[in-house]
Each structure stands twice: as structure tokens, then as C-alpha cells.
Amino acid sequence: GPMEVLTVGVVGTFAVGFLLERLVRFRSEHPRIELRLLTHNNKVDLSAESLDYAIQFGDGAWRSVQADHIMVAPLSPLCAPSLLEQLQHPDDLRTQRLLRSYRGQDWQAWLRAAGAKGVTPRGPLFDASAIMVQAAMFGEGVALAPPCMFARELQQGRLAQPFDLAVDVGGYWLTRLMSKEPTPAMLAFRTWLLAVV
């Protein structure tokens, strides 16, 4: 039969940190599905892009959207290994540039949980977490991001996690508009994705 096209929007961090290295397996298991991947910075608009699915980060409470929980992804500060010595205690973040994403409250949530005193998140704003973490690797500042999505960089010693504390502000979800009837290709992708996590 003809190829079935499947269009999936995915936030960049999840694409790079999890999905891309596993897509080979999906393609070999489903050779008749042509997967179109649209990477989005942090926000995915299901209706505007006529996406079949969107993989996004949040609490899962989106209106008129069917959301399947993929995984939790707690956030923790990440920085260049060269900054580790300067970061013995959460209060030490006072002297650092704190790189921020469009999710403005995330740093406050972590700093509160860490009991950090007198630390104000001041630093450049990024619209893509993956780019923000890249900037942190170059020593631009400290990023707040899910370590589980940057396991490779942490293992290779290109990135460091100065504190064990991670704060849970959301996770990754597979979402579709409730008004959209799932196609066989969509169901195949959903079954595959929820099984590999």
C-alpha cells in the first residue's frame, strides 16, 4: 500500500535528548510510515501546524487535548565543569548568570526547594532549552534543565550537575487534538513511544 504520512511536532530538548537516537528502531518496525518531524523550540501549536501529535513539556492539563504521559523530567542546574568548584552550595548561584527559558517560574521553584538565599535569576532568556544548555556548556552561565535529557553530555564530562536536587515542575507528554481521529500510523507511533520509555 501507499506510505502513510505521520507529522509529529516535538520540543527540541526531547528530540535531541531522547527521540532521535530511537527513531531508527521505529522506522525499521514501521517501514510504511513516513515520519515528518517538526522540532519546536518550547511551545507547540497543535492546530496551527496541523500536527498529528505534539510532544511537549508541561503538566498535561491542556484544553481540548488528549495527553499521554511519556515521562517525568525534573529540573536541576546544569553548568560547564569549570564552574563546579564555585558551586558548593545553592547560595553560590548568587554570583552566577542564571540562564532562563520562557518558563519563568522554574528557577524560583528550584531555588525555593533548595532553600537558597538571596539568589535572583538574572541572565539571558532562551526560547529553546537545548540551546540554553549548549550555552551553559560554553560557560555562559547555569541552566535549569532536565538532566535525564542531557545524560550523554554529562557522561562525556562536557556538562556538570553541581547539585543533586531536582524539582518536578512537569514532564513530557504525547498530545493530540481531541477533535482529531487517530489514524493507524498515529496509533502505531503512540504504542511504540509509550513502550520505549
Residue ranges and their predicted role:
Residues 2-62:
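Central regulatory/effector-binding core of bacterial HTH transcription factors
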Residues 13, 101, 179-180:
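Short, surface-exposed acidic/glycine-rich loop or hinge patches that mediate macromolecular interfaces
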Residues 11, 80, 177:
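Residue-level recognition of the GNAT/N-acetyltransferase active site
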Residues 165-197:
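A late-sequence structural motif
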Residues 7-9, 54, 99, 143, ...:
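Short, well-ordered beta-strand segments
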Residues 44, 48, 60-169, 196-197:
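C-terminal regulatory
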